Amino acid sequence: MRAYLDLMQKILDEGTVKSDRTGTGTISLFGHQMRFNLAEGFPLVTTKKCHLRSIIHELLWFLNGDTNTAYLKEHGVSIWDEWADENGDLGPVYGAQWRSWPAADGSVIDQIQKAVDDIKHNPDSRRIIVSAWNVGELDKMALAPCHAFFQFYVADGKLSCQLYQRSCDVFLGLPFNIASYALLTHMMAQQCDLEVGDFVWTGGDVHLYSNHMEQTALQLTREPRPLPTLVIKRKPDSIFDYKFEDFEIEGYDPHPGIKAPVAI
């Protein structure tokens, strides 16, 4: 994943020093895109070890429509703890918007199920979009959606996905985001009897936090290794029926992990 390292270097070379909501400070670029051919390997960063358990469980948590950290904590995933209240609640974050977007008539819209249905029955639609950016509920969310919306595209028997991420912590968050949406694309493709195409990542405010500079410099000294392969061991009845045990990453040989503080 040379493109990931190239982005880090570009931010260091061309970025603007900016303040931010957390008070940490960043070096930031506006607007960047990367494309990953999912048939050529699973895009999991190899220049540091990524916590795959957290990536998989978080995605399953989103797909379940869950917005409480209890499931995550039960499975040893702590990535949302800093934002949860004393009861583990986060407000109507990703899972709620994906699965239960509130409509004007009082009903709710399951955007994920609608996306599956459209991919299967109307694959040429240009409206196969899932949005977490619900303006009317942003104030109720513990954290406004960073990966705000994504679109699916079907061509030549392949399913591609493009994500728009309005705000991106490149050192800590981006490896998770790329792997998570690549995994989702594989799952959706399997459910819809398609091959995988590309995952396209588009970032808005793309930044490195000022307290991640040493870690970034270390990572830039490392040479990327071959990408691993994702194996999905079974095809469940629906996109909502996958289990953690259904996934295996083969051939993942990363450099050692690099710890860094989370900006809250």
Swiss-Prot record:
<feature type="binding site">
    <location>
        <position position="263"/>
    </location>
    <ligand>
        <name>(6R)-5,10-methylene-5,6,7,8-tetrahydrofolate</name>
    </ligand>
</feature>
<feature type="binding site" description="in other chain">
    <location>
        <position position="177"/>
    </location>
    <ligand>
        <name>dUMP</name>
    </ligand>
</feature>
<dbReference type="GO" id="GO:0006231">
    <property type="term" value="P:dTMP biosynthetic process"/>
</dbReference>
<feature type="binding site" description="in other chain">
    <location>
        <begin position="166"/>
        <end position="169"/>
    </location>
    <ligand>
        <name>dUMP</name>
    </ligand>
</feature>
<feature type="binding site" description="in other chain">
    <location>
        <position position="21"/>
    </location>
    <ligand>
        <name>dUMP</name>
    </ligand>
</feature>
<comment type="function">
    <text>Catalyzes the reductive methylation of 2'-deoxyuridine-5'-monophosphate (dUMP) to 2'-deoxythymidine-5'-monophosphate (dTMP) while utilizing 5,10-methylenetetrahydrofolate (mTHF) as the methyl donor and reductant in the reaction, yielding dihydrofolate (DHF) as a by-product. This enzymatic reaction provides an intracellular de novo source of dTMP, an essential precursor for DNA biosynthesis.</text>
</comment>
<feature type="binding site" description="in other chain">
    <location>
        <begin position="207"/>
        <end position="209"/>
    </location>
    <ligand>
        <name>dUMP</name>
    </ligand>
</feature>
<comment type="pathway">
    <text>Pyrimidine metabolism; dTTP biosynthesis.</text>
</comment>
<comment type="subunit">
    <text>Homodimer.</text>
</comment>
<comment type="similarity">
    <text>Belongs to the thymidylate synthase family. Bacterial-type ThyA subfamily.</text>
</comment>
<dbReference type="InterPro" id="IPR020940">
    <property type="entry name" value="Thymidylate_synthase_AS"/>
</dbReference>
<feature type="active site" description="Nucleophile">
    <location>
        <position position="146"/>
    </location>
</feature>
<dbReference type="GO" id="GO:0005829">
    <property type="term" value="C:cytosol"/>
</dbReference>
<keyword id="KW-0963">Cytoplasm</keyword>
<dbReference type="GO" id="GO:0006235">
    <property type="term" value="P:dTTP biosynthetic process"/>
</dbReference>
<dbReference type="GO" id="GO:0032259">
    <property type="term" value="P:methylation"/>
</dbReference>
<dbReference type="InterPro" id="IPR036926">
    <property type="entry name" value="Thymidate_synth/dCMP_Mease_sf"/>
</dbReference>
<dbReference type="Pfam" id="PF00303">
    <property type="entry name" value="Thymidylat_synt"/>
</dbReference>
<feature type="binding site">
    <location>
        <position position="169"/>
    </location>
    <ligand>
        <name>(6R)-5,10-methylene-5,6,7,8-tetrahydrofolate</name>
    </ligand>
</feature>
<dbReference type="InterPro" id="IPR023451">
    <property type="entry name" value="Thymidate_synth/dCMP_Mease_dom"/>
</dbReference>
<keyword id="KW-0489">Methyltransferase</keyword>
<protein>
    <recommendedName>
        <fullName>Thymidylate synthase</fullName>
        <ecNumber>2.1.1.45</ecNumber>
    </recommendedName>
</protein>
<feature type="binding site">
    <location>
        <position position="51"/>
    </location>
    <ligand>
        <name>(6R)-5,10-methylene-5,6,7,8-tetrahydrofolate</name>
    </ligand>
</feature>
<keyword id="KW-0545">Nucleotide biosynthesis</keyword>
<feature type="binding site">
    <location>
        <begin position="126"/>
        <end position="127"/>
    </location>
    <ligand>
        <name>dUMP</name>
    </ligand>
</feature>
<dbReference type="InterPro" id="IPR045097">
    <property type="entry name" value="Thymidate_synth/dCMP_Mease"/>
</dbReference>
<dbReference type="InterPro" id="IPR000398">
    <property type="entry name" value="Thymidylate_synthase"/>
</dbReference>
<dbReference type="GO" id="GO:0004799">
    <property type="term" value="F:thymidylate synthase activity"/>
</dbReference>
<keyword id="KW-0808">Transferase</keyword>
